[in-house]
Design a protein with these regions (language model features):
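Active-site nucleophile elbow and catalytic-triad environment of alpha/beta-hydrolase enzymes
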Residues: 153-169, 184-187
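Active-site loop/oxyanion-hole signature of alpha/beta-hydrolase fold enzymes
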Residues: 48-87
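Conserved loop-alpha-helix segment in the C-terminal half of the alpha/beta-hydrolase fold
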Residues: 39, 181-210
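Short beta-strand/loop motif that positions the catalytic acidic residue
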Residues: 173, 179-181
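Catalytic histidine-centered segment of alpha/beta-hydrolase-like enzymes
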Residues: 210-223
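Conserved HGGG/HGGXW glycine-rich cap/lid loop of the alpha/beta-hydrolase fold
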Residues: 9-57
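Flexible "cap/lid" loop of the alpha/beta hydrolase fold
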Residues: 96-104, 110-138
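Conserved alpha/beta-hydrolase "nucleophile elbow" surrounding the catalytic nucleophile
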Residues: 86, 90-95
Length: 246
């Protein structure tokens, strides 16, 4: 379905299944199809696969290039769908977006699975940090000639952006947070552990033999983790089912 923000910007979201809502947030210059192997979960849950502004089938990002702006646009979408509580599942920059959203609109968050995210640019290992600068420069250059790369260059600065949320907000969060990385990830291990420690109900998990793409490379484990989190959340707190406003 297509949703139009107050700004006129268009967000594309695929909604599958029924039940407890799980919102999937993809990484930088990717799209919701990244989570293709998670669609099997529609048998048990309501799944929302969101293309962030400037990505995938969504319209162009017209406002500022920031996680805060994307988080507020996501809030407009979820509010329009009358979602009271949901589990946020974010990969890479999508994990950063999930954390930014939780800091700004925590009342709608029932839990977070943050896979391979980094709340500061310094949380990346050296070579991936260097690659971010190279990628951004390459997109800008190619964008002078090719529209597809011009679009990529619009959102690539997010690769270097920090999550702008006071840590005190996270320390008061009542919901469970799982920070998942691979032992071959581009995110520093100590950085991921520090993110988990920000939350009273934070938990750090490291998957052996995996890198930055656990949802694709180890989907059985990833899906089981999502199921477990969603089931535990439902046992602890009654949550409403997604409803569409007429």
């Amino acid at each position: 379905m297509e949703f139009y923000c107050k700004s006129g910007e268009r967000i594309h979201v695929d909604i599958l299944g029924e039940g407890f809502p799980i919102v999937f947030l993809h990484g930088n210059n990717l799209q919701s199809s990244y989570f293709a192997k998670q669609r099997v979960l529609e048998k048990s849950f309501k799944l929302l696969f969101v293309d962030s502004l400037g990505h995938g089938k969504s319209g162009e990002l017209q406002g500022e290039t920031s996680f805060a702006y994307l988080a507020d646009s996501l809030e407009e979408l979820l509010s329009s769908l009358s979602i009271e509580k949901c589990l946020l599942v974010g990969h890479s920059d999508g994990a950063n977006l999930a954390l930014e959203y939780a800091g700004r609109h925590g009342e709608r968050v029932a839990g977070i699975l943050a896979n391979s995210g980094n709340i500061t640019f310094s949380g990346l290992k050296f070579l991936p940090r260097y690659a971010c600068y190279l990628e951004e420069w390459l997109y800008r250059f190619l964008g002078l000639f090719l529209p597809a790369f011009k679009r990529k260059s619009r959102v690539s600065p997010l690769l270097r952006e920090n999550v702008d949320v006071p840590k005190e907000i996270f320390r008061k969060a009542p919901y469970p947070v799982v920070v998942l990385v691979g032992d071959r990830d581009m995110i520093k291990r100590k950085h991921s552990m520090a993110i988990a420690k920000l939350f009273p109900k934070g938990k750090f998990l490291e998957r052996k033999g995996q890198g930055h793409n656990i949802p694709k490379k180890d989907s059985a484990y990833f899906n089981h983790l999502i199921e477990k989190m969603a089931q535990d959340i439902q046992l602890e707190t009654p949550v409403s089912i997604v409803r569409r406003k007429n």
